[in-house]
């Protein structure tokens, strides 16, 4: 998976012979003006690309910042899963704020304009963010797998989650050091190196051709293929537990909490508004937990699927380029450029997609997003939520009766 800030490795003005391109001194200024006017100035479709990058930049920064604020401001949202979601959002903010602008300029100008130091720093941070995202998604899947499939084997806590997050960043910062070590900035036109940074490229430089093949093969397996395969297996088992069979202990709870409809009707006649009996209440709580776990699992599976789809093109292109040596003498250069450019944009689009997924699939995050935008859209503010809660409280009596009746009817059906 190539760091998306280094597409400038494909030179803008390659020479057919591979020899340095020399210009007479009198023509340097005129040549630079020609390059800017007819070659580097964004074309029409590149303006579309710029607009797409700007949209992703704004959505990713605002959305992921709101995710972090939602968990920070609300103690009831400080769950283990949400701690990992915040960590994923922090990685998305990092890559969006630092790497996205550089990647956009490189894709448009096909030149590295930021010098040698940032040539090492930006690709390194890009690789670190990829590692953090993959490890975070892996820990989320592992936590859900233990909680749902093997709840008695491991007890996840917020303290352990925070320790895991620190470990994720430490491992990612350490294992991606080789990415920074091999990045070098060089100029395709040495004669113009002192006049402009146009057509400078930031690319990997290895001592032997075998090393990049080994490194990028391992990178693809460790940061994409293997973790996604393991996470797919984990979510498959989670899916079976939540939708195919009962959570461990639910069947016994079903029998234990069951009350006959006649007993339930007798309890209802004792008052105008009676709360569900303790056993029925316990079962209702268990059903509510089941529904909440299903919603959370559904949201996390969508996040994982979107991540896999967004990172698939750049992963495949990087393996083809670095391992199999393709695209060096591409006959259709524009098509190759378009593929790499679109794949770079998809990486950043994933950062913008996550907050959107949370908004549509998580009621708690959706309420917090509405509250955050209440200053601009009063109808979406806390007032509407308060009115909704008031109506809910007024109808709690009737809802509780209906819920208990539905539960007991379901129990009767299951046990008959």
From Swiss-Prot:
Site annotation Important for responses to orexin: residues: 36
InterPro entries reported in the protein's UniProt record: GPCR_Rhodpsn (IPR000276), GPCR_Rhodpsn_7TM (IPR017452), Orexin_rcpt (IPR000204), OX1R (IPR004059)
Keywords associated with the record: Cell membrane, Disulfide bond, G-protein coupled receptor, Glycoprotein, Membrane, Receptor, Transducer, Transmembrane, Transmembrane helix
Biological process, per Gene Ontology: feeding behavior; neuropeptide signaling pathway; positive regulation of ERK1 and ERK2 cascade; regulation of cytosolic calcium ion concentration
Disulfide bond residue pairs: 119-202
Family indicated by similarity: Belongs to the G-protein coupled receptor 1 family.
Biological function: Moderately selective excitatory receptor for orexin-A and, with a lower affinity, for orexin-B neuropeptide. Triggers an increase in cytoplasmic Ca(2+) levels in response to orexin-A binding.
Domains (record comment): The N-terminal region is required for orexin signaling.
Protein name per UniProt: Orexin/Hypocretin receptor type 1
Taxonomic classification: Eukaryota, Metazoa, Chordata, Craniata, Vertebrata
Designated gene of the protein: Hcrtr1
């Amino acid at each position: 998976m190539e760091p998306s800030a280094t597409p400038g490795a494909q030179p803008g003005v390659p020479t057919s012979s591979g020899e340095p391109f020399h210009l007479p001194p009198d023509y340097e200024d005129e040549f630079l003006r020609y390059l800017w006017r007819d070659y580097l100035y964004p074309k029409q479709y590149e303006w579309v690309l710029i607009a797409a990058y700007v949209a992703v930049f704004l959505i990713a920064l605002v959305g992921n910042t709101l995710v972090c604020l939602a968990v920070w401001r609300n103690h009831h949202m400080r769950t283990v899963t949400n701690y990992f979601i915040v960590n994923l959002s922090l990685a998305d903010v990092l890559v969006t704020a630092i790497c996205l602008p550089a990647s956009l300029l490189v894709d448009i100008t096909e030149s590295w304009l930021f010098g040698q130091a940032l040539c090492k720093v930006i690709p390194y941070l890009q690789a670190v963010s990829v590692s953090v995202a993959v490890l975070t998604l892996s820990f989320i899947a592992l936590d859900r797998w233990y909680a749902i499939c093997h709840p008695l084997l491991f007890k996840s806590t917020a303290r352990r989650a925070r320790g895991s997050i620190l470990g994720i960043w430490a491992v990612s910062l350490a294992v991606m050091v080789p990415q920074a070590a091999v990045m070098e900035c060089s100029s395709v036109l040495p004669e113009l190196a002192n006049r402009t940074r146009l057509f400078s490229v930031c690319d990997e430089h290895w001592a032997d051709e075998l090393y990049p093949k080994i490194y990028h093969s391992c990178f693809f397996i460790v940061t994409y293929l293997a973790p996604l395969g393991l996470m797919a297996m984990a979510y498959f088992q989670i899916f079976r537990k939540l939708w195919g069979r009962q959570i461990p202990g639910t069947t016994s709870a079903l029998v234990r909490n069951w009350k006959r409809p006649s007993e339930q009707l007798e309890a209802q006649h004792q008052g105008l508004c009676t709360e569900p009996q303790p056993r029925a209440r316990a079962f209702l709580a268990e059903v509510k937990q089941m529904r909440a776990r299903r919603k959370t699992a559904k949201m996390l599976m969508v996040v994982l699927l979107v991540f896999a789809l967004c990172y698939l093109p750049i992963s495949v292109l990087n393996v083809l380029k670095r391992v199999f040596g393709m695209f060096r003498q591409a006959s259709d250069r524009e098509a190759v450029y378009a593929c790499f450019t679109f794949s770079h944009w998809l990486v950043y689009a994933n950062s913008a997609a996550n907050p959107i997924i949370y908004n549509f699939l998580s009621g708690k995050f959706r309420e917090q997003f509405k509250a955050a935008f209440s200053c601009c859209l009063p109808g979406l503010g806390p007032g509407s939520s308060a009115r909704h809660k008031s109506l809910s409280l007024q109808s709690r009596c009737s809802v509780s009766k209906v819920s208990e009746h539905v539960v007991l009817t379901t129990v009767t059906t299951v046990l008959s």
